[in-house]
């Protein structure tokens, strides 16, 4: 043994001690914690991080020097309650105003609005001397406050992805229920074009959340800076994604903003919360893959979703909500109840199994029954049309990428993504008179839309679906009354399901077609109809379709989630494009007018509505809609014949009934029926066979299981018929 080896051996002996020894080496907790923190960050960190910071600091100093030279003038800040506060331009901020009101208010704020524009709380006011500036202060309870809070949380995630994974981040917006960030992650980020893609998985979440925790603890300020296109291209030279966005979104000679928090500097219009310390609870939820800008011809990216709150109690409540939503997931229930399935041989196209088809047909029958009462005529139209039709309608120029197209005999055809052009052809097929209007035409035709495979999700995002689609051709004078009729229709259908709903009137957007006078008149009619209706509605300014104003209807489910299903749209352009006309009431027999076209759907997509209803009812279908209404269970082999007789009577009366003739125990049969959510289980034995009766177990009255009195078959048929016809949701026989 060499001298050096002997020395090493001796050192090892000194370190070898028994567990019971008081001299045992104790772990250094501080060192371990430091080591753990260091392992969260790449070493060395990506070079672009320091390059960005150096450039940002230099440009920010130039900007601050410029602001320092700006003249200070007095401003009048008008709060929402009418109170007026004094301020100084380029010095006073919305946060200063909030602190002057109360510290508790300032501490809970997310963002402000200055003259209707979202504005960073720490950004000074700008304006002319003595100018009145309207100020709104928004906290997390407001929709806009939530969006800003989650947008800022996305930046925290972006910083984590850069520092922990070396990712090239792309887009990181807020969503209706949280936020996400898209990114490219490779095995080697030095040559992103050559390195293989690295998948982000939930195994990466602890590390990402660890960095996020540090970012939040450091209370990193969100700093805004306006940069020229030239400087932006220099700052983001390392990222082909950011470079593309700058080149395509920022005009030559133009400028836009970036925001910094800690080591992250990102292309962003903002605004943001004051600092990351406002985030008290942060959690990553799921991951998926996507394409850059949603285009399948672009690079495949990784997407990580998260949620955050300004209060840990809100996070606890949200996670509880997610657990409940998971139990109600229509994909889970659809599999358990054998309602539908999907197969890779036809992505995004639902295979409706027998029990799911029962639900589907019941929904369609509900609409058909109402159509007869409300003066609608049902039609059937082709599934594919020559591209010339789509050129006439305008869809070829604006919607072609969302269509499935193909060649037939050297002509280009497309599967229809909507029914309206076909209905226009029907209207134009012969001369029409004012006496025929309003003409209400309904269509359950199959529609195809070319959704990206990564966006497909159960019944809520599909490629093939059917709508309860209808179009009303009417005169301008009939618009208001037709809208009122649709409101009544909505109220009835949603009342059957037990949905609460609200409406939004979306008015003329910046880019529109047609005359302003026509728009104003149409919006006035819609607003008048909404006021007469008297329900919950608000104006969504500037969000109308380019061809006409619209009303969007949102329904609230059992989990208080809002879904947009129904829509009412006024269309002045398709009648023009198809040159639709009707003989007017004018005495001049050669006088013709253009009809107005109202696009209308109540369920929307039948597929999506089925998903919403599945989760709303948690698979416990109301009797009239249930695919499994009654299960007949004999207590023994001797009573199987009678059980089959009862089942046949139920079937002949139009009910969905089954009989369990398996060799399982009575308890097992009942349990199986309960798992499949049969509304009623009829137990039959000696007494029931002799009395021609059944013993009823109600799915929704668990405390009475096994204690129910027997009811004659004739009486129960009558009670079931009433329950079905009344479309009640209480599942109670009377």
Curated annotation (Swiss-Prot):
It is found in: Cytoplasm. The modification Phosphothreonine is found at residues 297, 381, 460. Gene3D superfamilies: 3.10.20.30, Anticodon-binding domain (3.40.50.800), Bira Bifunctional Protein, Domain 2 (3.30.930.10), Threonyl-trna Synthetase, Chain A, domain 2 (3.30.980.10). Its EC number is 6.1.1.3. Keywords: Aminoacyl-tRNA synthetase, ATP-binding, Cytoplasm, Ligase, Nucleotide-binding, Phosphoprotein, Protein biosynthesis. One of its GO terms (molecular function) is threonine-tRNA ligase activity. Residues 11-30 have a biased composition (Basic and acidic residues). It is an enzyme of class 6 (ligase). PROSITE patterns: AA_TRNA_LIGASE_II, TGS. It comes from the Eukaryota. One of its GO terms (cellular component) is mitochondrion. Coiled coil: none annotated. Residues 69-135 form the TGS domain. The modification Phosphoserine is found at residues 195, 289, 453, 457, 605. NCBIfam families: thrS. Belongs to the class-II aminoacyl-tRNA synthetase family. This is Threonine--tRNA ligase, cytoplasmic.
